[in-house]
Amino acid sequence: MPQNEYIELHRKRYGYRLDYHEKKRKKEGREAHERSKKAKKMIGLKAKLYHKQRHAEKIQMKKTIKMHEKRNTKQKDDEKTPQGAVPAYLLDREGQSRAKVLSNMIKQKRKEKAGKWESPLPKVRAQGETELLKVIRTGKRKKKAWRRMVTKVCFVGDGFTRKPPKYEKFIRPMGLRFKKAHVTHPELKATFCLPILGVKKNPSSPLYTTLGVITKGTVIEVNVSELGLVTQGGKVIWGKYAQVTNNPENDGCINAVLLV
């Protein structure tokens, strides 16, 4: 055995440390975070080369994943497809691939879902970050500009606890926090003042959804228990989605249409 392979020799004689495999697993888990940190801190030409290398690695990984996925799908083989009459026991081998059938099924389900939740406002203007988040300057010389204040109406749940003001990035003013919405039932043609349960989706950005920002076109969840709606099984419906149809920051109230 070569002289420099003393670690391998020791392992052959006495085995691994008891915590070796655990430490190795943890180190591999940390590696992605460490590489990310390294990439963020690098500057100049070294950073360019490192980013290029990481980019190539990611492309290679995606190609490998794609190849593995391709291996599991059955593709149509035109040469083997028999011509003319085919006996019943060979029908399942004919032309159509399993992947294509699955893809068509998924597309069909998506279409059904889209029809089920057809919204009153299919298209709305996207809200930019500049008009929705105001930069708040902090520090002794007002040089720090990492804090943002939400300038639109938002919903904050009852269980929400603020972070310490020193570390709070997004400020949601109390005057812009709304708890109720005027929801119109399209079939009953009646409007109800219902409590908001949460913000399902803000079309402008996922960040606004997590912040609970309510703008025109936002889908919110409202408490419809007092409407007395029931399912086919006879259970009372608790929450239902509604789409906001006005600009709440201008009108001072939230008007929405129930999605039925």
UniProtKB/Swiss-Prot annotation:
Coiled coil: none annotated. One of its GO terms (cellular component) is nucleolus. InterPro entries: NSA2_fam (IPR039411), Ribosomal_Se8/biogenesis_NSA2 (IPR022309). GO terms for biological process: maturation of 5.8S rRNA; maturation of LSU-rRNA. Residues 20-42 are annotated as: Disordered. Belongs to the eukaryotic ribosomal protein eS8 family. Ribosome biogenesis protein NSA2 subfamily. Component of the pre-66S ribosomal particle. This is Ribosome biogenesis protein NSA2 homolog. It comes from Rattus norvegicus. The lineage of its organism: Eukaryota, Metazoa, Chordata, Craniata, Vertebrata.
